[in-house]
Amino acid sequence: MSKRPNITKMLSDLVAKRLTAQNNYWAAEVNFDKNMQQNRRVDFVGFKPLTPDYVVAPTSVELGCFTCYEVKSCIEDYNSGNGLTFYGDKNYLVCTNELANELKNNLIAWPHNLSGVLCPTKNWKQLRLKIDLSGFQVYRIRPASEMLWAICQSHDYDRNGIYQYSEAEK
């Protein structure tokens, strides 16, 4: 039995924990260009509005920060051609320490717009930046309204309006 689904679930749970702890608006499995040939799905997308001095202004949404996370559990998953879609202002690959070391040691070309690689701590309690690739500023190419709408469409609410993260349930 492969450990891959279990590793993917544990990494996904850590991303959900991180997004919740950072008070982001977020959703898992966010689709862009749905029902089109170039349909792409991002594992997690988080949004934090810009609120200088804790004041919400009309520009808080457009100037806010979108963060995309792609979860990869093994080298086969990384090379599968699925995912590695980064549309955010910050974009992270989330993987095990072993996979991060393998990618770094084999001089794999990093995906365009990647900000860094996050890996779990030894006790799998949180994610830490293992490889920092933020040498230049990345700007999203999609408008905030489209990104927020994609997050809204991907939310999984129960009948009481409470968000249910489906990966944690499985």
Question: Which residues does each PLM region occupy?
Answer:
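Catalytic cores of nucleic-acid endonucleases
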Residues: 60-120
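Non-catalytic C-terminal interaction segments of nucleic acid-processing enzymes
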Residues: 2-28, 32-39, 105-170
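Active-site beta-strand-loop-beta-strand hairpin of nuclease catalytic cores
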Residues: 39-68, 85-86
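Short, flexible loop/turn elements at secondary-structure junctions
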Residues: 30-32, 48, 72-75
